[in-house]
Curated annotation (Swiss-Prot):
It holds the Pfam family UPF0060. This is UPF0060 membrane protein ESA_01751. HAMAP family: UPF0060. It is a multi-pass membrane protein. The lineage of its organism: Bacteria, Pseudomonadati, Pseudomonadota, Gammaproteobacteria, Enterobacterales. Keywords: Cell inner membrane, Cell membrane, Membrane, Transmembrane, Transmembrane helix. It is found in: Cell inner membrane. It comes from Cronobacter sakazakii (strain ATCC BAA-894). Belongs to the UPF0060 family. The chain crosses the membrane at residues 6-26, 29-49, 61-81, 85-105. One of its GO terms (cellular component) is plasma membrane.
């Protein structure tokens, strides 16, 4: 389960970077050249999704929980926003859902 969770975090990071770089270009006036690493990051994201050992719908559902946590870490580290109790509680609920889905992969 640890390997799967780490793979989910890598997948989420690739997706967030792939979306953040165009955001910098569109919202902050950064270089259009950021679109190239953004596209590469999104290709990595898609490839990483294929490495998960379950049906795509289950992978996407479970991945959502890890994405929430990764996005909140990004919010704190990159955006410099302090997380609230609600952020932590929501992330905990999302991660519990992910763990339940992943635990049932071999049983479904």
């Amino acid at each position: 389960m640890i390997k799967t969770t780490l793979l989910f975090f890598a997948t989420a990071l690739a997706e967030i970077i792939g979306c953040f770089l165009p955001w910098l270009w569109l919202r902050k006036g950064a270089s259009v050249l950021l679109l190239l690493p953004a596209a590469l990051s999104l290709m990595l994201f898609v490839w990483l999704l294929t490495l998960h050992p379950a049906a795509s719908g289950r992978v996407y559902a479970a991945y959502g929980g890890v994405y929430v946590m990764t996005a909140l870490i990004w919010l704190r580290v990159v955006d410099g926003v302090r997380l609230s109790l609600y952020d932590w509680a929501g992330a905990a609920v999302a991660l519990c859902g992910m763990l339940i889905i992943v635990a049932g992969w071999g049983r479904a």
